[in-house]
Structure formats: structure tokens, C-alpha cells
């Protein structure tokens, strides 16, 4: 076992040894050692003591380096150079990352990013179209007539079923003159919309028709229509 600085003085002696010379690098002081290994131990794990730091190393000869010394030294030099280049590259990338972080955290960048977000939101609002508003349709004359007729019939006879009142109201609508029905129902709808107050235009009186057996209603004499067609 010989250290690298003493290689020139013991080179001839090592070549005369009955074995194989391998190169081992100490894992503690990184000194390259020349180890003479007998041919019978080339497939074994041997213990080597470093002549520089006296550390004990376990060397697997199956993985040991048997290449010439000058090639091993050049490979070690390239390995160290590569490590230095990698470290320098990592340092440059770390500096660039720090600079980018400082730019992103600066107030100017935050303000500009918020402005961009506001512009995007405003664009979205401009693109979205509002759906058309649904207009509430005014109730028809028939609906107004049926509603008021059912209310009137139930006021006279509270025990009357809604279905029966609806059927009777429909019959009354069918037997009334069409023009009279439409005008009366329309006027009554307009009167109810005025503060929900029922004006004299929707005051009716009832009488039973003895011949046909159905109910009628007609406007009073003081209403805006004057006499009804049945008087």
C-alpha cells in the first residue's frame, strides 16, 4: 500500500509484486492509493489502510479500478470540474429565482396584476348578455269574469264546492252576450288594479232565470253601461 506522492520511488517494486495493482480513493481524505492485490483475492472484499489519514477502507475488488493512474487522475479531475460547473449552474438558477420572486412580490407587480384581473372581469361582464325580461300579461276578460263569478257564488253559498262554482261560472259566461261579458270583465279587472278597490263598475245584481235554470248577472242602472240587454 503506497500513497500517490511516493509512487515514483516504489513503482518498480510494485510492478514486481505477484498480483494486480488497483487504484483506490480514500473516502475520508480523497487520497488516491495504489494497492497491490494478489490474483487469488481479486474477487474478494479486502480491508485497506490509508497511508495518509490511517483510515480503514473496505474495498470490493470486483468494483475496484484497474485502469492506468494517469487516466484515473484525469477522470477525477473531470469529475471535480463537473461538480464545480453543476454548483455554479445551481447558484445562477437560485439567484435568478430570487430575482423573479422579488419582482413578483413588488408592489408595482401586484398593482399591475390586479389591474389586469379587473380588465378581464370587465370584459367578461361586457360579453354576458342579460336575458330578456318577461312581461307580465294582463289577465284576460274570461279569467277576470270566472274569478269574480266564483267569488260571488261562494259569498252567496259558502258550502258550494269550488268545482261546482267554477262550472256554474263557466255556464254564466257562455250564456251572457260575448260583447257584454268581455267589456264587463275588462272593466272590472282595471277597477281592481286601482288600489284593489272595487268601483261601481263591478257592482252586479243576480236574478234567477226561471225558463233556462241558470244564473245571470247584469249591471245596475247607475253603472257606466246604462241598462243591460235583458231589461
From Swiss-Prot:
It comes from the Eukaryota. It holds the Pfam family YABBY. A zinc finger (C4-type) spans 26-53. One of its GO terms (molecular function) is DNA binding. SUPFAM superfamilies: HMG-box. Transmembrane segments: none annotated. Keywords: Developmental protein, DNA-binding, Metal-binding, Nucleus, Zinc, Zinc-finger. It is found in: Nucleus. GO terms for biological process: plant ovule development; polarity specification of adaxial/abaxial axis. GO terms for cellular component: nucleus. InterPro entries: HMG_box_dom_sf, YABBY, YABBY_C, YABBY_N. Essential for the formation and the abaxial-adaxial asymmetric growth of the ovule outer integument. Interacts with SPL/NZZ. This is Axial regulator YABBY 4. It comes from Arabidopsis thaliana.
